[in-house]
Amino acid sequence: MKISLKRIDDAFNFEAVNEDGKTVLIDAAEKLGGRNQGVRPTQMLLMARAGCSGIDIVSILKKQKQQIDDFQIEVEGEREVIKEEVAKVFAEIEVQFKLQGNIDPGKAKRAVELSMEKYCSVEKTLRLAGAKIGYKIYVNGKEA
């Protein structure tokens, strides 16, 4: 896996490109001198967390012939300073999986568990870094 990052203005705006030519803009907050024209690196980490499970869960549920009409994942992370360092790390992350459709809640729950515990490499990376990750699953508005 390889990406390339290029600065595209005189501030903090960067364009990241993957091996397939797909791009994403990265920028700092305005209060730090950025222009707010891209996502923050830590936001990208939470996006990656959601995307990783999203792919896992859709794959599992499709194999089980579950009809997914809508699927949203919301991720909220709390960061804290470790010891005397300036950088903040994610200490706690809460994930909400919201599925709509003709979906068996038990199958949805199992798909999420498999992603969280076995398949999602972003999840494993965050846990190894010390983040405590919790989650809730909703199928058609009801907690599963």
PLM feature spans:
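Extended beta-strand/beta-hairpin segments
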Residues: 1-47, 58-144
